[in-house]
């Protein structure tokens, strides 16, 4: 589906989010520069940024590996076109789908649904359905960013998030594929993992669709967009847009599949915060609400689950290992 409304950012009243907040700005900048676009080789959409069960952990992600790479943080958005993240010293140890459950968080769509009166796909209807492709729907946010001086702090944080997200090595089975073979392989993996096409007409089918979206979030934004566009069940399920409860369910389940055992709290939560930003930016592609509404959902989610802790630990720059020299 990969479409949103054509309404401009300023045309839709924002509810729970503040477009001047640091969270909203980070999400908007990250969505524009690091998701759903023709990216440089280091951001190749051909690579899945997840880990398979058969892979062994490849060490830990040291603080040094965060601070050795210098990213462009000053100037206009055009400076992002030639980002070079360099070679990572080590890889984050993350095994998806072998996550240690954390206290207080539900572990499945059914469990999450049981906590509230709404089903897994409550929707908040708009007055109409607009079918515009992603590049066009993003234009309102791009225009706003182009007309403003880029906040160097926001740029540095968003770029560091991209560095963190793209530091994951892809699964060997997918890394060895290329071109059309890769696309076929990804589709095949998803098909057999979920035993055929998803059906949203019953609760089990709805849970399966949520699980498939969670799985797709582990791949590049471009790959996610292609798979959603091909799956009629997914497309029809989100025609009326996501509600915040469904948005939260998907994001919660995605983050639960990240294994951070053995790492310090700062590293573990900092890594999850980066993954949350990446997932939120991708989720704007499967919803038919105006883009700013989804960014608002993301802002609300970050404020609820990450921002208080981030501030208590020195701010976004501190937890992501960004030096003052990089921001100034």
Swiss-Prot record:
UniProt motif (BH3) ranges: 213-227
GO MF, any single term: protein kinase binding
Keywords for this protein: Apoptosis, Cytoplasm, Phosphoprotein
Motif (BH2): 309-316
Role, per record: Plays a role in apoptosis.
PANTHER family on file: APOPTOSIS FACILITATOR BCL-2-LIKE PROTEIN 14, SI:CH73-248E21.1
Gene Ontology CC terms, in alphabetical order: cytosol; intracellular membrane-bounded organelle
Post-translational modification: Phosphorylated by MELK, leading to inhibit its pro-apoptotic function.
One BP annotation, GO: apoptotic process
Modification sites for Phosphoserine: 44
Compartment annotation: Cytoplasm
Keyword presence, Cytoplasm: yes
Family note: Belongs to the Bcl-2 family.
Official protein name in the record: Apoptosis facilitator Bcl-2-like protein 14
Coiled-coil regions, chain positions: none
């Amino acid at each position: 589906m990969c479409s949103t409304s054509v309404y401009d950012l300023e045309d839709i009243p924002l509810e729970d989010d503040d477009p001047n907040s640091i969270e909203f700005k980070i999400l908007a900048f990250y969505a524009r520069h690091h998701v759903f676009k023709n990216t440089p080789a280091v951001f190749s959409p051909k690579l899945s940024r997840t880990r398979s069960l058969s892979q062994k952990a490849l060490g830990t992600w040291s603080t040094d590996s965060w601070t050795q790479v210098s990213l462009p943080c000053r100037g206009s958005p055009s400076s992002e076109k030639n980002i070079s993240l360099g070679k990572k010293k080590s890889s984050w140890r993350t095994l998806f789908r072998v996550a240690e459950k954390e206290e207080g968080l539900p572990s499945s769509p059914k469990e999450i649904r049981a906590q509230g009166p709404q089903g897994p796909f409550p929707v908040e209807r708009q007055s109409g359905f607009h079918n515009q492709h992603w590049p066009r729907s993003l234009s309102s946010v791009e225009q706003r960013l182009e007309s403003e001086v880029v906040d160097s702090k926001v740029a540095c944080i968003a770029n560091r998030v991209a560095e963190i997200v793209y530091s994951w090595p892809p699964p060997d089975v997918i890394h060895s594929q290329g071109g059309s073979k890769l696309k076929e392989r990804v589709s095949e993996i998803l098909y057999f993992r979920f035993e055929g096409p998803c059906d949203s007409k019953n609760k089990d089918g709805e849970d399966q669709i949520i699980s498939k979206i969670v799985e797709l979030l582990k791949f590049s934004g471009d790959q996610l967009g292609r798979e959603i566009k091909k799956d009629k069940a997914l497309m029809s399920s989100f025609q009326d847009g996501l509600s915040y409860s469904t948005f939260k369910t998907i994001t919660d389940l995605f983050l639960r599949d990240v294994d951070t055992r053995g790492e310090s709290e700062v590293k573990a939560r900092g890594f999850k915060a980066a993954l949350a930003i990446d997932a939120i930016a991708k989720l704007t592609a499967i919803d038919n609400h105006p883009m700013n509404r989804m960014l608002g959902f993301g802002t609300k989610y970050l404020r609820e689950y990450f921002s208080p802790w981030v501030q208590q630990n020195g701010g976004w720059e501190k937890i992501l290992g960004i030096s003052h020299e990089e921001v100034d």
